[in-house]
């Protein structure tokens, strides 16, 4: 009884994986995923005039972006 339940469950999992793989090939999932990843990397490459969360800063200067403040103890931008 346990073996037959295990085989039935394994068969369902295999059916799901095969169906998902064939569907993702139709949608060109890998290409879409890679294009989205590279689009995010291009966005990160843009220079901005302020420093974001976790960036090093000098407490005396106002270098952090809005809604962030430079921690005098740790010397990095943190949320206010």
From Swiss-Prot:
It is found in: Secreted. Disulfide bonds join 50-65, 57-70, 64-77. Expressed by the venom gland. The keyword Signal applies. It holds the Pfam family Toxin_12. Residues 22-48 form a propeptide. GO terms for molecular function: ion channel inhibitor activity; sodium channel regulator activity; toxin activity. Residues 1-21 form the signal peptide. It comes from the Eukaryota. Keywords: Amidation, Disulfide bond, Ion channel impairing toxin, Knottin, Neurotoxin, Presynaptic neurotoxin, Secreted, Signal, Toxin, Voltage-gated sodium channel impairing toxin. GO terms for cellular component: extracellular region; host cell presynaptic membrane. The keyword DNA-binding does not apply. InterPro entries: Huwentoxin-1 (IPR011696), Huwentoxin_CS1 (IPR013140). Monomer. Lethal neurotoxin. Selectively blocks tetrodotoxin-sensitive voltage-gated sodium channels (Nav). Does not affect tetrodotoxin-resistant voltage-gated sodium channels or calcium channels. Belongs to the neurotoxin 10 (Hwtx-1) family. 51 (Hntx-8) subfamily. The presence of a 'disulfide through disulfide knot' structurally defines this protein as a knottin. This is Mu-theraphotoxin-Hhn2q. It comes from Cyriopagopus hainanus.
